[in-house]
Amino acid sequence: MIIEKLMKQADFTDVEKSIAAYLMKNGFDVKNMSIQSLARATFSSPSTITRFCRKLGLDGYKKFQILFYSEYEAFTNQGVVDANYPFSGNDSFEQIVRKLAKLNNETIRKTVSGFDYNQLHRIVQRMSRADMINVFSVGTSATVALEFQQKMLRFGKIVNLTMSSCFLPGYALTATEHTVNLAISQSGENRDVVESLKLLKKNKRYCIGITATPDSSVAKMCQEVILVDIQEQYSYEEKIDTFAVYSAFHFILDCMFSFLYQLDYESNEKETKEKAYFIKESKEQ
């Protein structure tokens, strides 16, 4: 394999080691680089690149270019992307894009593999009959839930959500026996969310938890719990930002919206189109 030879660097000269290092760092760029461009980028010459390709067992740069890119693409798709530090300071834009795409795909795959479809049916049936849905979340979780709220409103489902945590206890106290209360928290220990759940539990209200922590307060106090298998730290001191958890929560809420919409597809489609028409009409007046 070309990649293996580039990593071992057996019998490489200093110049060849420099070329190998460049290729391993900027492999995706090679697809569109001429031999002259690669020579300039590695401070070598076209003849040096040609000799290097032959040393790798190939008869020229063109063949090397095709085979190397194919191997490099497969090589970079191996392994697990660190959810806390999915890219490094040395990565190219293309490498960052591929790593984030891989992290997102892997996050959704793991989320789907953990779904209990009987549970999802129970939750969706309860949501469909609810007088309203209260969302208890803060920070990133609340940002994800905001889009869910907007989507649900399109077919007439009331979702209460606030970006100010001081209002969460009020939602808990006004919840009825027909209200679905949805708590979203990665750690499952956010103080404002947990305190609201205590009020809900005291009043024997129905609660659904979405969390990454199975033994958390949120998981223990909710009748239904959707767990996400995400190896991402809670503290921003231990990660670049929130990537995997955001993707997992967003995907789950997208599924919830889709399940509810599908329950009465024709009616919901009609309602969303009517709302879109009225909104358009009001803007034109």
Q: PLM features: residue spans?
A:
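Short, Lys/Arg-enriched N-terminal segment that forms or immediately precedes the first helix
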Residues: 1-9
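HTH-adjacent hinge/linker in prokaryotic transcriptional regulators
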Residues: 2-3, 14-15, 28-32, 40-43, ...
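Generic structural signal for well-ordered, non-membrane alpha-helical segments
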Residues: 12, 16, 35, 42, ...
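Pre-recognition alpha-helix immediately N-terminal to the DNA-recognition helix
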Residues: 18-24
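CheY-like receiver
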Residues: 22, 123-126, 171
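Glycine-rich phosphate/diphosphate-binding loops that line cofactor/substrate pockets in enzymes
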Residues: 118-130
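Glycine-rich phosphate-binding loops that contact phosphosugars or nucleotide phosphates
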Residues: 128-247, 251, 255-263
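A short, charged, Gly/Pro-tolerant segment at domain boundaries
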Residues: 264-285
